[in-house]
Amino acid sequence: MVNIISCLTAQELKPNNHYNLAQKELIKRGYGMFIHFGLNTFAELEWSDGSIPVDTYNPTNLNCDQWVKVASEAGFRYVLLITKHHDGFCLWDSKYTDYDVMASPVKRDIVKEVSDACKKYGLQFAIYYSLWDRHEKSYKSKNFNDYITYMSNQLKELLTNYGSICEVWFDGGWDKPVKDWQLPKIYSMIKKIQPKCAVGVNHTISYPDDLRKSVLPDSMVIDNKYTFQYFPSDFRLWDPKIAHKLDKKRYLYQGESYYLPFEHTLCISKAWTWFQKEKNLPVRSLDELEELFYWCTDNNNTLVINIPPDKTGNIREYEANAIMELAKRIGIKKDKPLPKNGELLSLNSEVVPSSVFQENIQLYGGKYATDGGMQTLWRAADTIATLTIMLPQKPFNKISIFEACEQHVA
């Protein structure tokens, strides 16, 4: 017991006003490819309830090497792989369940193949693991410690059998009270096995007066105002929202301040499709991808873009081409720092709109065109409208306009 306590103490997250080692490495890599693949791919679903038969998983031409090769050629620094989604289906050979790839018609360890391919192409390897498990019986046990043991055992498999893991991305925490997850214990276990690994939990930050109400990234513009919902964490997540241009990094836990960068998650698809569908879906334009790249990798934050394989087990050529074209356009080079955008001259500039919808300045005022928030907007009352922006007397060579659309930014 003394040794265990010693290990836990050594791996505590310390209050700080600047990034720690794991956060420094997270910020440095900056740009990753998200890969959603599993039972949902073959069921045409985004989420499933853990009841889909395991033999539904049946890729016809599985090629994990192709996934990572695309990531490498597109300039990604790391691959973030779904190892287990909310349905509980595992993409590796787990000793603790038969709801995994080894019980399917295609008995190949996806986690191993992706990890090996990352080593081959010189990329870092990260894993997504859903806390919520809709298949595992112990999840519904009266003694939830049974599930914590199950989860801990699976995480140990992932952290010890597949080489270096740069990041663990947890999801689904909303399904249970925060304390049930025993996150300090899980965090310390991860750090003991993989000390440089960054750990994050989706919906990381909450309001001080309501610890189960997560704060949207657009509101995270004041240091030390909001508190951890999931402590400890090395970085913030709010999938798939986008941080404010004035995003702040310091958040509170028990009166102490901690530095937390933000990791963005986007889909290559305009339809916000995480698991690939039978029908080919349009991808975001290069213009949109370029501006989102610059926005999301700015200010010591990071970006992962989801490019999911289809039922054959391959990334579709048109999606691979789109992300590689982005790398060419903005000049992403392997072993070189990520490209940076120029100064945003219009940020918080004075504006004069020709009209405001319903004269509701609080919701749709012209100031929201330049406030740096992706969730706020100027909305005119007229079909044809103008917005005058008072810019500083500095040269510029690009104008970027984000249009508010119903399902995604454009």
Which residues does each PLM region occupy?
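Bacterial Sec-dependent N-terminal signal peptides
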Residues: 1-11
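Mature catalytic domains of secreted/periplasmic carbohydrate-active enzymes
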Residues: 9-371, 378, 388-392, 400-405, ...
